[in-house]
Each structure stands twice: as structure tokens, then as C-alpha cells.
Regions:
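…primarily DNA-binding HTH/wHTH and HhH modules…
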Residues: 169-193
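Residue-level signal for inorganic ion chemistry
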Residues: 120, 134, 162-163, 185
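Basic nucleic-acid-binding alpha-helical/helix-turn surface characteristic of O6-alkylguanine DNA
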Residues: 1-141, 192-193
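Regulatory, non-catalytic segments
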Residues: 142-157
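Local cysteine-cluster metal-coordination motifs and their immediate loop/turn environment
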Residues: 156-167
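Pre-recognition alpha-helix immediately N-terminal to the DNA-recognition helix
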Residues: 115-119, 146, 184
Length: 193
């Protein structure tokens, strides 16, 4: 398992967790609390993620664990990671970038989850749909709450663009990053709500 940190100017430092063939986790850039790291952090990191019985659910629980287990690795060591990190950095610099071709780890997912995933990945750059519309697109017209739950648990933000799914009367939610972050992502794509 490879963990690569990447810097996104004006956004912070994010992380990509990759198993060599597919994305396992993506942590959106957040401001860096440690001033010694700075906003120009270099891609680095190799670590191990311990799978749960149901598969890999998330990286280790604490950043100190992640940092302690890292050895220095450049993104170029894994071409798929280098490409994905480059596209993420382009996206955060304002370029129109799509991620529909990025392979993700959906092992153990239900048919419903796979259908919602496929429908969400078809939402284009600069487009938004409501939770209800996404439920219809996925073939589950009465499952808007379940779709909202799927969005809330999305471990592949941007690659699976949950930020493009909004409530019928506003932005909806965006987990621990909050509505300002979601609004900022949408504004980057030319969407104002």
C-alpha cells in the first residue's frame, strides 16, 4: 500500500492511498498545522493499511501512525499514483479535470453502492444534481436518503464527485470539511449556489 502526500496551492496537503492498481482512499487537502511542512510538501510516503474483515475501510486512525510508518517514496515510483496526484494538483489549480477513469477499490460493495457510484461518476465537471436526482439516475428513485448516506461515506472525494450532489433546497452537507469547502470546490468548477 502506498500513501502519497501532495500539496495543492491555497488548499493544503492531501493524501492518496493506492495499492498499485487502484485507489483505496483519498483525503482532500487541508491546511497544514505544522509550519515546518509548508504548503509545498513533496509527494512522499509508503505505509501499510491493515484491512478489516470486510476489506480496507480507511487508512490507519491517526496521522501520527501514518507519519511514523512512512518511508520516503516519490509519486513517480508508482506511475498510476503519479498520474492521479498530477491531475489532483491540476484540478486544485483551476484546470478542468475529470477522474472517471481512475480505478477505485469497490471490493465488497453492494449492487446499490456500485450503481450509485457509477451514476455519481457520470456527473460532469461543473454540474450538480440533487440527492433525489442521483437516486433516480442510479435506478433507485425512492432511495435519496440512502444516496445521501453513500455520499457521506465516500472515501474517494473528487474521484467520486460527491461534492456535485446537493440537497433540493441548498448545498446539503460535506462531512468534516463543511459547507464552505464544498462551496469552494463547486466555485472552482464555476458553480454558485
Amino acid at each position: 500500500m502506498t500513501c502519497v502526500s501532495y500539496a495543492a496551492e491555497g488548499w493544503g496537503v492531501g493524501e492518496v492511498w493506492h495499492d498499485g492498481s487502484r485507489l483505496v482512499w483519498h483525503e482532500l487537502p487541508r491546511p497544514v498545522a505544522d509550519p515546518s511542512i509548508g504548503t509545498r510538501a513533496r509527494a512522499r510516503g509508503r505505509t501499510r493499511v491493515t484491512p478489516s474483515q470486510g476489506g480496507v475501510n480507511h487508512p490507519p486512525p491517526s496521522r501520527s501512525t501514518i507519519t511514523a510508518k512512512r518511508s520516503r517514496v516519490r509519486a513517480e515510483a508508482v506511475p498510476e499514483v503519479e498520474s492521479l496526484v498530477g491531475r489532483l494538483q491540476e484540478y486544485f489549480s483551476g484546470a478542468r479535470v475529470e477522474f472517471a477513469d481512475a480505478q477505485i477499490d469497490a471490493e465488497g460493495w453492494t449492487e446499490f453502492q456500485r450503481d450509485v457510484l457509477a451514476a455519481m461518476r457520470r456527473i460532469g465537471y461543473g454540474e450538480v444534481v440533487s440527492y433525489s436526482e442521483l437516486a433516480h439516475l442510479a435506478g433507485y428513485p425512492r432511495a435519496q436518503r440512502a444516496v445521501g448516506t453513500f455520499c457521506a461515506r465516500n472515501r474517494f472525494p473528487l474521484v467520486v464527485p460527491c461534492h456535485r450532489v446537493v440537497s433540493s433546497d441548498g448545498l446539503g452537507s460535506y462531512g468534516s470539511l463543511g459547507l464552505d469547502y464544498k462551496r469552494r470546490l463547486l466555485a472552482l468548477e464555476g458553480v454558485t449556489l
